[in-house]
Amino acid sequence: VNERLKANALSIIQANDLDETKDTLTVKCEVISADRKRLTAVYKGDRMSDGAAYPVSVFYTNTMDLNQVRDLGLSDFTDGYTMAGYVLSDDVEFLGVTQEQKEAFLKYRDSLDMDILTEVFNGADFPLASENAWPESFSYESHGTICFSVPVPHALGDYVIVTFNPSTK
């Protein structure tokens, strides 16, 4: 289990083709839940590529089924199509965004459609499709609420976290 968690945590380096001698990656891990069945780690930070004008905000998660030693992802809790519809709906809710950030995202959202978002969410989370493919979205479940990232332009913060509570929808 520990080796799998470590490999997933460090996979951002190869998947984003980071040069450890020139690029900078700063990530903090928070274990948001852990019990005998499941462990969920949330990683947040920044990466700065050599020669880049600014750092990019990084968000990724790893939820592991400890009994089966397998990664759990968005598809274990819901489906990409449903979440795409939710993100495009008037009911969408966010985690940790200001009113200004919410308004900016809602304007940006007009450039998105069901197909784009469904593809993003269907490819969310670990395991990676290949060692050089990094998902555009990561998710976790906390107390019945599904939290997942939506990629946005750098000017909007690189990602927003959307929350979905199936029991209230």
Per-region residue spans from a language model:
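Compositionally biased intrinsically disordered regions enriched in Thr/Gly
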Residues: V1-K169
